[in-house]
Swiss-Prot record:
Organism: Aliivibrio fischeri (strain ATCC 700601 / ES114) (Vibrio fischeri)
Family matches, as InterPro entries: FAD-bd_OxRdtase, FAD/NAD-bd_sf, FAD/NAD-binding_dom, NO_rdtase_NorW, Rbx-bd
Name of the gene this protein is made from: norW
Enzyme class: oxidoreductase
Subcellular location per the Swiss-Prot or TrEMBL entry: Cytoplasm
Reactions the enzyme catalyzes: 2 reduced [nitric oxide reductase rubredoxin domain] + NAD(+) + H(+) = 2 oxidized [nitric oxide reductase rubredoxin domain] + NADH
Gene3D superfamilies: 3.30.390.120, FAD/NAD(P)-binding domain
Identification of the protein by name: Nitric oxide reductase FlRd-NAD(+) reductase
Lineage per the UniProt record: Bacteria, Pseudomonadati, Pseudomonadota, Gammaproteobacteria, Vibrionales
Primary localization: cytoplasm
Length: 381
C-alpha cells in the first residue's frame, strides 16, 4: 500500500483539497490531522453569525466524522502535530510517528493582536475559526458594548454584523479610511457613512494603546486620547500565518510558508496551501485563490504537476448595509480612476499608464454590474 497523503489542518483549504482529490480518485489514502473536531463549515458564514443569531452547531455543514466517512479519509481529531522530519518523511503527533508520501501544510492563520498595554489584553477576543466562535459566542451575546480593533475587510464586516445584532459598536482603525489596503478613500467614505448610520462609532487615524479591566468590562484608551468603556474587545487587525511547524522543520518561511507555483515548499514532497502559504511574495487569504490552489495541488498530488495560474479575482465585502465588490488592482500604481456615482451606488474603474483597465469597484445596487465588468477586465488583461 502506498504511503498516504498527510494533511495538517482541517480548514477550508484542507477540505477543498480533499473534495477536489476525491472527484477523480477515491482510493488514495488521506490522513488529516487537526487540533479541533474537524467539522466542515463555510468560513465566510462567520461574518454574519451574530446578526443571524446562529450557534456554532448551526454553522456546521458536516460533522468531522461524517466528512471523514463521505470523503474516505482518516481523521485524527483533537491531535497536535509536534514535528516534521523531512529526512525520513514522517510527522510526530501526540507522541506517535506517521509516515507520509506527500505532506500538505494547511495550518491556516491566527488573528494578529497588536501589543497593547494593560491587564485586559489577555481577554481580547478573536473570530477566525468555528472553534474561536464557539469560544467567544456567549461573551459576545452578553455584551452590549463592543470595540473592534481594525477597519479592514474582516473588522468592517464584523462591526456591521454586531451593529445589526443590536450591539453598540466602536471601530478603531489606524489608517485614514476603512479598507485602506483594498480601496482608495473616496470609495470607502460611503461605507463609513453606512457604518455611522447603523450607530457604529468609527474612529480613524487612531490606535488602541491599552485595554484595562474595570469592575464591569474594560476601559480602552487610544493614542489620540479617547477612552471607551466596553464589555468586550475583538481584534480584527489582520492575519498572521501559522508557520511554527514549518520553521521548526527548517522550511523556507517569510511572511508565510514560501512555496513555488506548484505549491511545493523548500523541502521535497511537502506542500503548503491556504492562509499559511506565501505565493510569489503574497499571502492571499481569500476564497478564490485558495480554490484555485486546491484545484492545482490536487492534480499535482495525483501525479500531474500543475502550476498555479492566478487570474484576476473578485472580492466581496460582506457589509449588507453597503455591499461592495471589487476585482483586479484597486490600490497601487493606478494612473487614473473613472468614477460614476448615482443613487444606486458607485462604479469606479482603475486604469494604468497605458489606459488599460486594471481593476474596478462597484457598490450598493451597482454590484449587479460586477460580472460584466469582470469579463471586461479579463479581456483586457
Amino acid at each position: 500500500m502506498s504511503l498516504p497523503i498527510v494533511i495538517i489542518g482541517s480548514g477550508f483549504a484542507s477540505y477543498q483539497l480533499i473534495k477536489t482529490i476525491r472527484r477523480t480518485n477515491n482510493d488514495c489514502p488521506i490522513h488529516v490531522f487537526t487540533n479541533d473536531s474537524g467539522d466542515d463549515y463555510n468560513k465566510p458564514d462567520l461574518s454574519h453569525v451574530f446578526s443571524k443569531q446562529q450557534s456554532p452547531e448551526e454553522v456546521v455543514t458536516l460533522s468531522g466524522g461524517d466528512f471523514a466517512e463521505q470523503y474516505n479519509v482518516i481523521l485524527h481529531r483533537h491531535t497536535w502535530v509536534e514535528s516534521i522530519d523531512t529526512e525520513i518523511q514522517a510527522i510526530t503527533a501526540n507522541g506517535e510517528q506517521y509516515a507520509y508520501g506527500k505532506l500538505v501544510l494547511a495550518t491556516g492563520s491566527q488573528t494578529f493582536i497588536p501589543p497593547f498595554h494593560g491587564d485586559g489584553c489577555g481577554d481580547i477576543l478573536t473570530l477566525n475559526s468555528l472553534k474561536e466562535f464557539a469560544g467567544i459566542q456567549q461573551k459576545v451575546l452578553e455584551s452590549k458594548k463592543v470595540l473592534v480593533v481594525g477597519g479592514g475587510l474582516i473588522g468592517t464586516e464584523l462591526a456591521m454584523d454586531l451593529a445589526n445584532a443590536g450591539k453598540m459598536v466602536t471601530l478603531v482603525e489606524p489608517n485614514t479610511h476603512l479598507l485602506a489596503n483594498m480601496v482608495p478613500d473616496f470609495i470607502s467614505l460611503p461605507l463609513e457613512k453606512a457604518c455611522k448610520e447603523k450607530g457604529i462609532t468609527v474612529n480613524l487615524s487612531d490606535c488602541v494603546q491599552a485595554v484595562n479591566k474595570q469592575e464591569q468590562g474594560y476601559r480602552v484608551t487610544t493614542s489620540n486620547g479617547h477612552s471607551y468603556y466596553v464589555d468586550c474587545v475583538i481584534s480584527a487587525a489582520g492575519l498572521k500565518p501559522n508557520t511554527k511547524l514549518a520553521t521548526e522543520a527548517n522550511l523556507m518561511v517569510n511572511r508565510g510558508i514560501v512555496v513555488d507555483l506548484n505549491l511545493q515548499t523548500s523541502a521535497n514532497n511537502i506542500y503548503a496551501l491556504g492562509d499559511c502559504a506565501e505565493i510569489e511574495g503574497k499571502v492571499m487569504a481569500y476564497l478564490q485563490p485558495i480554490l484555485l490552489s486546491a484545484n492545482a495541488l490536487a492534480k499535482t498530488l495525483l501525479g500531474t504537476d500543475t502550476a498555479l495560474s492566478m487570474p484576476n479575482m473578485m472580492v466581496k465585502v460582506k457589509t449588507p448595509n453597503y455591499p461592495i465588490q471589487l476585482a483586479g488592482n484597486t490600490s497601487t500604481d493606478i494612473e487614473r480612476w473613472s468614477v460614476d456615482i448615482d443613487t444606486q451606488g458607485l462604479c469606479a474603474k482603475a486604469y494604468n499608464i497605458n489606459n488599460q483597465l486594471t481593476g474596478f469597484v462597484v457598490t450598493n445596487e451597482r454590484v449587479k454590474n460586477a460580472f460584466p465588468l469582470f469579463r471586461e477586465l479579463n479581456t483586457t488583461n
